[in-house]
Each structure stands twice: as C-alpha cells, then as structure tokens.
Amino acid sequence: MFDLNQSLFLRALRRQPVERTPIWIMRQAGRYLPEYRKVREYAGDFLNLCKNPELACEVTLQPLRRYALDAAILFSDILTIPDAMGLGLYFAEGEGPRFTNPLQDTKAIHTLKIPSIPESLSYVFDAARLIRQEMPKELPLIGFSGSPWTLACYMVEGGSSRDFKRILNLIYTEKEAAHLLLSKLAASVTAYLIEQIKAGVNAVMIFDTWGGVLTPQNYKDFSLAYMHQIVQQLKKEYPDIPVILFTKNGGQWLEWMAETGCDALGVDWTCDLASARKRVGGKVALQGNLDPAVLLTTKNCIRSEVGSVLASYGYGTGHIFNLGHGITPDVPPENVAIMIEAVHEISPQYHL
C-alpha cells in the first residue's frame, strides 16, 4: 500500500528531499472549470454545493481528473463556522458572501454561541470522508479554515469590505469584546480542523485573508496570537499533520509566523521568494507564489514566470508551487495545464 508520507507534497512540507517541486492551486476546484460550473448550476447555488457531500466530493475530484496535481483541497468555504454560529450565510450575486445576522454590537459578541462543531458542520466532514475514499490513494487531501481574525472581519462587517471600518473600530475601542470574539472563533477553528483531520485530511491550511490590513502590533495581538494558539493545539493532538499558515499581504511578518510552530507559510506574489527563504527557510517550507494574473497571459509568458518563481526559491526542497492567491474564474483551463507542465519540466533541475 502506498505510504502517503512519501507523497511529494508531504515530503516538501517537511523539507525532505523530493524529485521535483510539488504543485497544487488555491481554488483549484472552481469556476474556471466548465465541469464545475455544470455541477454548481445543478446544485442551485454555492452554499447548496458546499452542503452536499456528494457534490462537494465531485468538484474536489474534477481538477485531479484534468491535471497532474500533487494534492486535493477539500471543497468548502471559510465562512461555514460563522454560518454554524447562526449568522445566516448567503451569497448575493456579484457581491460575494453576506450575513443576515452580522454582529452589530458587543452584546451580540457576548451572546454568540460556540456551536457543536461535529454536529453543526457534519456535512463538511462527510464530504472529507467521501473525498478521501474516492480520490487517488497516493495524493494527500488538504483541509482548511479561515483564521479567527478573517472570520471576525466578515462577521462584524456583515460581508466583505473595502475599509474594514467596523472591525477596526472594535479592536481600538472595545478590545475586550474583540478578544472574546476571537477566542470563541479560535476554539471553533481548532475543533473544526481536528474534525477534518479525524475525517481523513492529511494537512491543514489556515487562510488569514485579511491579516494584512492590520498594523504590525495589531497583527500580532488580534490575528497571529490566535493562529499560534490553534497551531499549538493541533500540534499537541496531531504532531504529524502539517499546518500551513497564509496571511495575504503578510510578507513583512514571516519571521513571526514561522515562530508559531507551523510547518509551512503560504506567500503571496508581493513577497520575494528568495528573500523569504533566506529569512525563514531554515524553519518552515514555503508555498507560492505565482501572480494569478500570469494565467491570463500567453504560453511563453506563463512558462517564463513559472521559471522565475522556481529560480527565485532555488535549489533544494521545502517549496510547494502554488499561486499567490486563488485562481480567478476567467482563467482558460488550458493555461493551468501549461503552468503545471512547466513546473514538472523545469523543477527537477533544482532537486538533483
């Protein structure tokens, strides 16, 4: 039987030697694929798709059938936890995620219940079990969650925001309530990731999409401290399950992030991979960081930019190739194939 620990992805995460650089793509199951759009149409809406384990399994497997990827990522949404807390998640056409019951005052934070994660989010774990059963045995499955700070941003703002005025006001004027909210979310995220691990995921990733809007001190206090807590708890219970942290626009804080005990850091395209490796490569693996916009260009441009990312990281292990953020819906599927082939062709020279 194939030992999953021998997979390229898990070996690179642990900074063990690999024959070539592994690759997967954030949002690899997504709207750029015509087969995904068909299933989503059948589901009726995005949330129905997330909450139906069979359909979530199908869309998770779609990119694996099409491309030679080195990992699958569980199909779900980062806002399942706030939805389970009773905030009423829905997706408005062209507006992204919204909540019918956002947290409008500190009273709402105090009365916010921590849900029973195994029961309220059973559809996620059912999907994970089904995916693990149906997907190629030699490929790892990645589980994920939003970070407490990122979830809090959506919950207080009522959806995505341009300026995050309400949540920033909260951390400056109602620190205690902000920390209470983040503590409740950290407990829920920890429980959520543990249940995903029990359901069969082989690595987990924490998406801190909005950590980059904070000042350095506020990032430490209101985002990183809670991710640190989660990593420590996960490592205590599951020391062999790798944890990846990703803060968008967080390139200036890599050293702090590497101190959490995580195994790898996701880096976006604004961060120089060579200097990131110099700074933290002795402690953690790095994942990234092709600019997603490159996938809207030409074959030659894609191959050249893939080569630049690989050269920037340089020789040796500890690099997982990915985009610097999620793939966009307008990317031609054939351009994804060009990127993957380029990684397969160019990266072996860095692992001789």
UniProtKB/Swiss-Prot annotation:
Which InterPro entries does the UniProt record give? Answer: UROD/MetE-like_sf, Uroporphyrinogen_deCO2ase_HemE, Uroporphyrinogen_deCOase
Supply the CDD domains for this chain: URO-D
Q: Would I find Acyltransferase among this entry's keywords?
A: no
Say yes or no: keyword Lyase present.
yes
Q: Which sites bind substrate?
A: 27-31, 77, 154, 209, 325
Q: According to its UniProt record, where is this protein located?
A: Cytoplasm
User: For this protein, what is any one GO molecular function term?
Assistant: uroporphyrinogen decarboxylase activity
A single GO CC term, please? cytosol
Record-linked SUPFAM superfamilies? UROD/MetE-like
Q: Which Gene3D superfamilies match?
A: 3.20.20.210
PANTHER family linked: METHYLTETRAHYDROFOLATE:HOMOCYSTEINE METHYLTRANSFERASE RELATED (PTHR21091), UROPORPHYRINOGEN DECARBOXYLASE (PTHR21091:SF169)
What is this protein's record name? Uroporphyrinogen decarboxylase
Organism the protein comes from: Legionella pneumophila (strain Lens)
Instruction: Identify the coding gene.
Output: hemE
